[in-house]
Amino acid sequence: MTQVQGIEMRAAVATFAKVVCAACFLASSFAYAQLFTFPKQDLIDYTAKSSFDRLPDGRPKVPDSMIERARGMSAEEVWATLEEKGYNNQYADGFQILHPGKTMVGRAFTVQFMPRRDDVDDVAEAKAKERGLPHLGNQFAIDMLQPGDVLVVDLFGKKVDGTIVGDNLFYYVMKATHGGGLVVDGSVRDLDGLSEIDMPAYFRAADPTPIGNVMLTGINVPVRIGGVTVMPGDLVFGDLEGVYFVPPQFVKEMLDRADEIHVHDEWTKKKFDEGKYKSSEIYGSPKDPALQKEYREYLKKRLDEIHKKEGQQ
């Protein structure tokens, strides 16, 4: 590509994202047109409220220690912080859940598909050929996954031909992310095989057809999952109810608040175990000044212990 061609191409791209590569093929009869993605600096700009370090692709890197802390949280604790901040569109439900007893936590790696359109596909195929891109299709995105990622895929609710993975690729995702997880507004296949792989997944349906008649249009861009706008690098939290997508700038506060709630619950139950108090004397906060002082001291001691332990991990 000449310098002039490069300038013309960049000028044609929307300010929200830039084209960095085009179509990838599978060995079957269909192709994927792609791809819009954030250049690293744009991704940093759109997630500038996060103070965390950055992954090589520019996503906020919620620390591994915080990901582990989040596994002990409840959905109510996640929601409380989001609601307080006014982020009321961060929850998606209505999924089928693989391994429903296993909490899913990780950093969002987002992928977007759209229904295939031939004239768009033709241009994308030509650009892919110019750039010498491999014929990988959905695997192009999957091969970019890193440890700690959760693969978050907008497949516009597609069931037939909307299967982002079968058991082989699901196993690869598990290995690449170290068991992070999968959220897809679409379907999966080989459900019997998936059930034998120890990684949580949230999906709309299972279907025997391979993925097809779609275009891969975005990697690490904002995607829609249900009524949620998911940003690359969001903390993904999945439980028995559904999936929460937490902006990184709220993660530390959310975890600190959860620690305080856990300690409060711990102290409350200890006092109940003593058999000396009525519930109204202890829950939700102690009424007696001496008990209030005891609780404050207990809270400080336990939080110091928790944070010291986390610092050693």
Question: Which residue ranges define each predicted feature?
Answer:
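Bacterial N-terminal signal peptides
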Residues: 16-29
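Buried hydrophobic positions in well-ordered alpha/beta secondary-structure cores of metabolic enzymes
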Residues: 58, 173, 234-236
